[in-house]
């Protein structure tokens, strides 16, 4: 069966060539978002320090000080996402990119290629660029019309929110932060591909804090050799798909707790 490349990156390059004013407005929006992320990261540092201090003093999830610290951290996350929403909405209302003749033409060609496909494969790569290009061309609704097989960063964009995370960085321990909202095709979860490589999952406090922070969304670790189908059923390696719990453990992913989503499958 032939594979058709939707060529989203090349499509955006074409928009850069024929609609420089629109692309400049998009770049200004992205620059404003980057500036907000600087404030967001500064706020995260302080908020996470409070969470870790409360956990260290009383290693109980029910500790009211820990719960309050988690709520503060969640408020920081929500503030960032609200600011990101504001910038995206402002750009859409002011520039109306999907109504721009150049975007209509290029987007139409993308949708024509997609219409002839029996399924959509979404690979990984730079999840931020992937999410931005898909969003720029308004592929949200088109994603719901096809069976999807996605892995790594491709799986991340299908969830409600996209979390960047890495406990092992060149400058020490990294801090998890939201990149943006995902497309919400798989509700109720945040996907964490290659979590074993990127997170200190052997430390119960790390697992518990991240799970508490993301609640009520469920953090699901995706490892090589396994996946989740459209009905929430896991396949492949039994230990490849696990959920981080607020008790500090990794548990088998339980589809009974998952809200039904679209026809999609996520893999590491």
Describe these PLM feature segments:
Residues 63-143:
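Active-site periphery "cap/insert" segments of enzyme catalytic domains
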Residues 113, 123-126, 131-202:
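Class I SAM-dependent methyltransferase SAM-binding "motif I" and its flanking Rossmann-like core
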Residues 1, 5-77, 164, 168-268:
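C-terminal and late-domain segments of enzyme folds
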Residues 119-120, 147-148, 218:
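Beta-sheet entry/capping signal
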């Amino acid at each position: 069966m032939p594979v058709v490349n939707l060529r989203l990156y090349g499509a955006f390059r074409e928009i850069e060539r024929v609609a420089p004013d629109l692309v400049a407005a998009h770049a200004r929006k992205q620059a404003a978002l980057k500036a907000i992320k600087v404030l967001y990261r500064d706020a995260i540092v302080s908020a996470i320090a409070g969470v870790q201090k409360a956990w260290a003093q009383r290693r109980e999830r029910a500790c009211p000080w820990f719960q309050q610290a988690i709520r503060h951290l969640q408020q920081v996350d929500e503030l960032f996402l609200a600011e990101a929403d504001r910038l995206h909405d402002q750009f859409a209302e002011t520039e109306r990119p999907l109504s721009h003749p150049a975007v209509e033409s290029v987007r139409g060609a993308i949708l024509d290629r997609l219409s002839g496909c029996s399924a959509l494969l979404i690979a990984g790569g730079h999840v931020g660029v992937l999410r931005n290009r898909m969003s720029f061309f308004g592929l949200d609704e088109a994603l719901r019309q096809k069976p999807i097989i996605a892995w790594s960063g491709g799986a991340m964009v299908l969830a409600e929110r996209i979390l960047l995370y890495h406990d092992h960085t060149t400058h020490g321990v990294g801090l998890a932060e939201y990149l943006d909202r995902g497309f919400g095709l798989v509700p109720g979860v945040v996907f964490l591909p290659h979590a074993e490589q990127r997170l200190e999952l052997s430390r119960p406090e790390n697992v518990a804090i991240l799970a508490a922070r993301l609640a009520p969304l469920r953090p699901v670790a995706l490892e090589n050799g396994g996946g989740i189908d459209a009905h929430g059923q896991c396949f492949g390696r039994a230990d490849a798909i696990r959920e981080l719990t607020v008790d500090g453990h990794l548990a088998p992913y339980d589809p009974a707790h998952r809200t039904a989503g679209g026809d999609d499958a996520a893999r590491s």
